[in-house]
Amino acid sequence: MINHKFDAETTPLYFYFALKRSYEIYAVYFLLLIICITGFGYPLHALPAAGWLIVCLLARYYINHTFIRWNLLFYVTISAGWICYFLYYYGWETGATSFILPLLLVSMFSLYDTLFNKIAFTVFLFIMRMALFFHCQTHPPVYVLTGIHILIIQILNTVVFFVVTSV
């Protein structure tokens, strides 16, 4: 247990480090994604990933300066926002839906949420995934990537998914 100076209660060390490591992993992910998208010849398309990288680094920095509950909310917002953005702009085939599972795990292992909140969050993630699925099935992505680009992004997303899930 760690006494987080901004919380009235103690924070389990594993939860604190899981959030901290997740931010670090996502920062590396966004950096690699910027390199990939720029390498594909679309440097302007990398700007949103650069924005998410900055937000992720700020959230990582402020993990020691804000309530752990707020950090959990930041993590969920960063992740859910990225999933929605990425699927909308690059399509279903890129594997971004995999990042829903770490969100579900963080919620389930959070000591700060009631059972009702955990169930409500699970329903929210389910609805979000289904809405994104139906959208991607009925609309083409904004940026159409080539087959090899989709493969590279799919591999990157799969590797990062397994790494972030393992923390």
Model-predicted regions and their roles:
Residues 71-76, 118, 146, 150, ...:
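Residue-level signature of transmembrane alpha-helical entry/exit and packing/kink sites
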Residues 106, 114-118, 157:
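Alpha-helical membrane-associated segments of multi-pass integral membrane proteins
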Residues 15-93, 97-107, 123-130:
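Hydrophobic transmembrane alpha-helices and their membrane-interface boundaries in multi-pass
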Residues 45-52, 147-158:
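Alpha-helical transmembrane segments of polytopic membrane proteins
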Residues 1-14:
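Short, Lys/Arg-rich, polar N-terminal cytosolic tail immediately upstream
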Residues 137-146:
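Membrane-interface helix termini and inter-helical loops of multi-pass transporters
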Residues 156-167:
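Juxtamembrane or sensor-core-proximal signal-transducing alpha helices
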Residues 111-133, 150:
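The cytoplasmic-loop to transmembrane-helix boundary for the fourth helix
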